[in-house]
């Protein structure tokens, strides 16, 4: 019974901490997503132009046509 009470109090405490800290970070998820996309795109450059050969791991600027093995 004591263990159950301690677990319930701990869960409620952690939930309260999550709720109080989430108000201060409102609207930053979009910024984080944009930053992560920018970082990924910077890591992948330089990309291959259209007509270049591509494989299973696409390094094309656009998409990879797997059937023709060429960047589109």
Curated annotation (Swiss-Prot):
What is stated as this protein's family in its record?
Belongs to the conotoxin O1 superfamily.
In the UniProt record, which is one GO cellular component term? Answer: extracellular region
Protein name as it appears in the record? Conotoxin Lt6.3
User: Where is the secretion signal located?
Assistant: 1-22
The compartments listed are:
Secreted
The tissues where this chain's protein is expressed are given as: Expressed by the venom duct.
| Coiled-coil stretches | none
| Statement: the UniProt record of this protein carries the keyword Disulfide bond | yes
| Keywords per UniProt | Disulfide bond, Knottin, Secreted, Signal, Toxin
Q: Report the SS bond pairs.
A: 47-61, 54-64, 60-71
Which InterPro entries does the UniProt record give? Answer: Conotoxin (IPR004214)
Identify the species of origin.
Answer: Conus litteratus
MF terms per GO, please? Answer: ion channel inhibitor activity; toxin activity
Regarding domains, what does the record say? The presence of a 'disulfide through disulfide knot' structurally defines this protein as a knottin. The cysteine framework is VI/VII (C-C-CC-C-C).
């Amino acid at each position: 019974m004591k263990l159950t009470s301690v677990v319930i109090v701990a869960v409620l405490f952690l939930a309260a901490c999550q709720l109080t800290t989430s108000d201060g970070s409102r609207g930053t998820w979009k910024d984080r997503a944009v930053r992560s996309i920018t970082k990924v795109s910077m890591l992948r450059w330089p990309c291959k132009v259209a007509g270049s050969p591509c494989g299973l791991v696409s390094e094309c600027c656009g998409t990879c046509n797997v059937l023709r093995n060429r960047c589109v």
